[in-house]
Swiss-Prot record:
The protein's name in its UniProt record: Ribosome maturation factor RimP
Family: Belongs to the RimP family.
Keyword set includes Signal: no
Entry keyword set: Cytoplasm, Ribosome biogenesis
Database matches in HAMAP family: RimP (MF_01077)
Name of the encoding gene: rimP
Matches recorded under Gene3D superfamilies: Ribosome maturation factor RimP, C-terminal domain, RimP-like superfamily, N-terminal
One Pfam short name: DUF150_C
Taxonomy of the source species: Bacteria, Pseudomonadati, Pseudomonadota, Betaproteobacteria, Rhodocyclales
Length: 146
């Protein structure tokens, strides 16, 4: 079983959402970002400890070698990757970087309008744009401090 499948199965099985995974260049440190959409208070230390303990056991059973495992909440500027995320965070400020420039630009920031027919809607200062979901390289929420 590959690492991503192992992580997804374990994290979802514990009732959390796997948001993102980062690995150090040599693969010795694994950073796992989890969320609990059903929980109003978000992720806390107990949630991280629960996932860490379970993943450590699973890695031992699967004989997966690593030096360090870090479990964290996705933070205020969380990564937005899955199609469902682009719907869930509709109405929020987002930064998007595309692989292939659109209108001479690769970077966009504006209000997320959602995902429809494979296109992500974005309200910019002057107009609205639609970006191909498959062309998105990276997307992050932009925290607001009002």
């Amino acid at each position: 079983m590959d690492l991503n499948t192992l992580l997804e199965t374990t994290v979802v099985g514990l009732g959390y959402e796997l948001v993102d995974v980062e690995m150090s260049p040599r693969g010795r440190t694994i950073r796992v970002f989890i969320d609990a959409p059903a929980k109003e208070t978000g992720i806390d230390v107990e949630d991280c400890a629960k996932v860490s303990n379970q993943l450590t056991r699973v890695f031992e059973v699967e004989n997966f070698d690593f030096d360090r495992l870090e479990i964290s909440s996705p933070g205020l500027d969380r990564v937005v990757k899955k199609a469902a995320d682009f719907e869930r965070f509709s109405g929020q400020e987002i930064q998007i970087k595309v692989r292939i420039p659109q209108g001479g630009r690769r970077n966009f920031q504006g209000e997320l309008l959602g995902l429809k027919d494979g296109k992500v809607g974005l309200r910019l200062a002057k107009d609205d744009v639609e970006l191909e979901f498959t062309n998105i390289e990276k997307a992050r929420l932009v925290p607001r401090f009002d």
